[in-house]
Amino acid sequence: MNPLTFAMILLTIMLGTTIVMTSSHWLVVWIGFEMNMLAVIPVLMKKYNPRSMEAATKYFLTQATASMLLMLAIVINLIYSGQWSTTNPLNPTASIIMTLALAMKLGLAPFHFWVPEVTQGIQLSSGLILLTWQKLAPISILYQISSTTNLNLLLAMSILSVAIGGWGGLNQTQLRKIMAYSSIAHMGWMTAIMVYNPTMALLNLVIYILLTTTTFSVFMLNSSTTTLSLSHMWNKTPLLTTALLMTMLSLGGLPPLSGFLPKWMIIQELTKNNSVIVPTTMAITALLNLYFYMRLTYSTSLTTFPSTNNMKIKWQLNNTKPTIHLSPLIILSTLILPLSPILTLLE
């Protein structure tokens, strides 16, 4: 793709998301979502082949359906309230329909089926945009309507998402699918706390984006797409492999790494609100996520691919790609937990 064209497309994606996040008029919010969706499709098809074409088509059909539901919710709310403003409380029916539309856009269970399929069919860089930037707009609207959202609906979807996100990733060997299922599980954690403490959901989103960006950056640096390709990494880049190991364990939510912080805070907040069964169920199902990340770390660092080369480091295959941006990302992805006392400000 022409660099100028690609830059314009990325600018449109950012503009669409910014419009959604800053607008106070429901019609403008809907237009922002449409701009964002239509601009991201060429990014998904950056490397043109039948697989990416299929992924982009699946993405378009899902997002178009979600946009239709979103517009239906906006119209129902307009009929009952006569207001276009996003600051006014939503009608209960409109709120349920809008929650379902946003769940479809986020890939929450039971609307999650498109996420692994689309992520698997596109490049790693496009997958990074899909699983990080594309979550910002729907989460921001969910944040705005959190006071009128149906709590039982959100909790049911969040428990299902955490369970499916863990269960679906167990037998996978494709890294993109594993990251997609991880994304479904993380979205489940975010929606569980959205009604009780929306600010904490945003904290979870920031940490999730940080961890996912770091993991994808390492995958892109080594062109890794399967668990088998991870076993080659130790010979080429041992330091980077160690960093990836820590980041993946952090994504799984293992203490004392950064990924444990949002889970800990969410479980604490839900328990404070006299909800014990929900956090207990989510904590148990989160172990599935941790298990498949432990499998990944095993294939990354504890297995060495058979080689006829006696040298421990393959110096002739030195990577020339820039890695300067990875240093702060890796530090933030693994060492945020000591800052947790500051987060009492959220309460």
From Swiss-Prot:
Query: Any coiled-coil ranges, and where?
Result: none
- Reaction it catalyzes: a ubiquinone + NADH + 5 H(+)(in) = a ubiquinol + NAD(+) + 4 H(+)(out)
Please give the chief subcellular localization of this protein: mitochondrion
Q: How does it sit in the membrane?
A: Multi-pass membrane protein
Please name the GO terms that the record assigns under molecular function: NADH dehydrogenase (ubiquinone) activity
Broadest EC class assigned to this enzyme: translocase
| EC number(s) given by UniProt | 7.1.1.2
What's one Pfam family the UniProt record gives for this protein?
Answer: Proton_antipo_M
Any transmembrane segments, and where? 1-21, 25-45, 59-79, 96-116, 122-142, 150-170, 201-221, 242-262, 274-294, 326-346
Disulfide-bonded cysteines: none
Q: Which domain of life is it from?
A: Eukaryota
Q: Name one GO biological process term.
A: mitochondrial electron transport, NADH to ubiquinone
Tell me a GO cellular component: mitochondrial inner membrane
Q: Which UniProt keywords apply?
A: Electron transport, Membrane, Mitochondrion, Mitochondrion inner membrane, NAD, Respiratory chain, Translocase, Transmembrane, Transmembrane helix, Transport, Ubiquinone
**Oligomeric and partner information:** Core subunit of respiratory chain NADH dehydrogenase (Complex I) which is composed of 45 different subunits. Interacts with TMEM242.
The entry assigns this protein to a family as follows:
Belongs to the complex I subunit 2 family.
- Functional summary from the UniProt entry: Core subunit of the mitochondrial membrane respiratory chain NADH dehydrogenase (Complex I) which catalyzes electron transfer from NADH through the respiratory chain, using ubiquinone as an electron acceptor. Essential for the catalytic activity and assembly of complex I.
Q: Which PANTHER family has this protein been placed in? A: NADH-UBIQUINONE OXIDOREDUCTASE CHAIN 2 (PTHR46552:SF1)
**Protein name per UniProt:** NADH-ubiquinone oxidoreductase chain 2
